[in-house]
Regions:
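Glycine-rich phosphate-binding/hydrolytic loop that grips phosphoryl groups
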Residues: 1-13, 81, 85-89, 210, ...
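Nucleotide/phosphate-binding catalytic cleft detector across ATP-hydrolyzing
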Residues: 1-39
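Generic recognition of flexible, low-complexity loop/linker segments
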Residues: 25-30, 37-41, 72-77, 217-223, ...
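Phosphate-binding glycine-rich/basic clefts of nucleotide- and phosphate-handling proteins
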Residues: 53-188
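Intrinsically disordered, low-complexity acidic Ser/Thr-rich regulatory segments
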Residues: 24-38, 123-142, 190-195, 199
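A short acidic Gly-Thr/Ser loop motif
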Residues: 33-50, 54-57, 79-81, 235-237
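Adenine-nucleotide phosphate-binding core of ATP-dependent small-molecule kinases
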Residues: 184-223
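Glycine-rich phosphate-binding loops at beta-strand->alpha-helix junctions
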Residues: 228-238
Length: 238
């Protein structure tokens, strides 16, 4: 409703009929016909993605008054945190685009050795992983992986195409704890502060599409089924 209010008052100068004629559709009612506008909204938060669809009708005698009718609302347990996990795993850690995997390969390690190092430090809990190791893994993700990916997402939002980024640039305001740095250096055999983190917008977009494609396909079907005239995307990941 805030969206409609701002658009009608700021852009259309309260010319409600013209706005509804452009974006809305005519429907039949008991008293004849009227023009309605169906607005779908997707709010991608950290933990859930919330979908709402609402139909609006206006009164020709009082065009400033809109009658909202909610017709669909639901939440999906896939959102920004899930996308962030995919980006960290596929861009920072492992795979064809994994920066750490590339750094380990420069040491002349075989694929099995690289996988073992990455799994021992970042993988799921296993019987060789001590409580201290689990805490270090958690702290590394919170103090290193997440800040780097947020930095990448900000570069993407700013329209940056390609950059190599130093440790000092990313952690200029707050550095990871020395315990985390020392544990990483010991386990990986790499100096964390010497790594050049390569930002590539094409790689970012590829993995964002991979992470969100399934969710967006399902939501697109819902929006189409309810014949949405306008679709709004909100939330930080958008």
């Amino acid at each position: 409703f805030v969206y409609l209010y701002s658009v009608l008052t700021e852009r259309y100068k309260n010319l409600t009929k013209e706005f509804f004629d452009i974006y809305g559709k005519e429907i039949r009612t008991e008293t004849g016909s009227s023009t309605c506008l169906t607005v779908g909204s997707l709010d991608i938060g950290a933990g859930t993605s919330d979908v709402t669809i609402c139909s609006y009708e206006y009164n020709e005698l009082k065009p400033s008054q809109l009658k909202p009718t909610p017709i669909f609302w639901d939440s999906f347990d896939y959102a920004g945190d899930d996308m962030l996990r995919v980006l960290i795993n596929n861009i920072l850690l492992e795979g064809q685009d994994g920066i750490l995997q590339k750094e380990l390969s420069k040491l002349g390690l075989e694929a099995s050795q690289i996988y073992s190092k990455l799994f021992d430090f970042f993988g799921a809990d296993h019987n060789r992983l001590s409580f201290k190791d689990r805490m270090v893994r958690r702290d590394f993700n919170a103090q290193v992986s997440v800040p780097i990916m947020y930095y990448f997402l900000n570069l993407l939002s700013d329209g940056e195409q390609f950059r190599e980024i130093s440790y000092d640039e990313i952690f200029a305001k707050q550095s990871p704890s020395q315990v985390v740095i020392d544990a990483f250096n010991e386990k990986m055999g790499i100096d964390l502060k010497s790594i050049r983190w390569t930002f590539d917008s094409a790689v970012m977009c590829k993995h964002i599409e991979y992470a969100m494609d399934n969710l967006l396909e399902h939501i697109a079907v819902i929006m189409y089924a309810y014949k949405c005239d306008i679709v709004l995307l909100t939330g930080r990941p958008t």
